[in-house]
């Protein structure tokens, strides 16, 4: 889920200190916007976006993103999505009733950049946050990205030592 690091000269006290930092790892990817759910505060604001990606020429449901947009952005998104309204979901497989509840479906023409923590076993985004629209990418080119192959580990930059001996002198 992330990394915990400490300042090099930081102590090891019990409890939390500023010398220790927790950093969460996340992915970032573009998704096609297939619909939206109006905000519970105002129907003129987006509450969440319904996302998908192309696979084998078909649009696949990837989940929703309901955080990361300001009130202004949420209002602007409704203005951009309203002209694209359609009656049916654009996905190859019909979403479940729960996934489709309250959704205003749109033509899959806009692309959102989304930051997220992981994919579930069912292929749904976890802990997604909207980061903006991508005007430079056509929706038809958006597919699920595969992680790059892991690089070979670098040689350690820090020598591990003990006051009385050196560990792994060849490293």
Residue ranges of model-derived segments:
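Catalytic cores of nucleic-acid ligases and guanylyltransferases
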Residues: 1-171
């Amino acid at each position: 889920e992330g990394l915990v690091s400490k300042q090099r000269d930081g102590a090891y006290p019990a409890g939390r200190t500023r010398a220790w930092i927790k950093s969460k790892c996340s992915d970032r990817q573009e998704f096609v916007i297939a619909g939206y759910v109006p905000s519970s505060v105002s129907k003129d604001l987006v509450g969440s976006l319904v996302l998908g990606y192309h696979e084998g020429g078909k649009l696949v449901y990837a989940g929703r993103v309901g955080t990361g947009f300001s009130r202004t952005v949420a209002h602007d998104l409704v203005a951009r999505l309203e002209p694209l309204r359609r009656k049916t979901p654009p996905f190859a497989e019909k979403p479940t009733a729960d996934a489709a509840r309250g959704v205003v479906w749109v033509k899959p023409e806009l692309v959102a950049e989304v930051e997220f923590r992981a994919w579930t076993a069912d292929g749904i985004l976890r802990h997604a946050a909207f980061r903006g629209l991508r005007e430079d990418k056509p929706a038809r080119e958006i597919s699920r990205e595969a992680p790059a192959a892991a690089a070979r580990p670098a040689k350690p930059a820090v020598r591990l030592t003990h006051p009385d001996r050196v560990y792994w002198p060849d490293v």
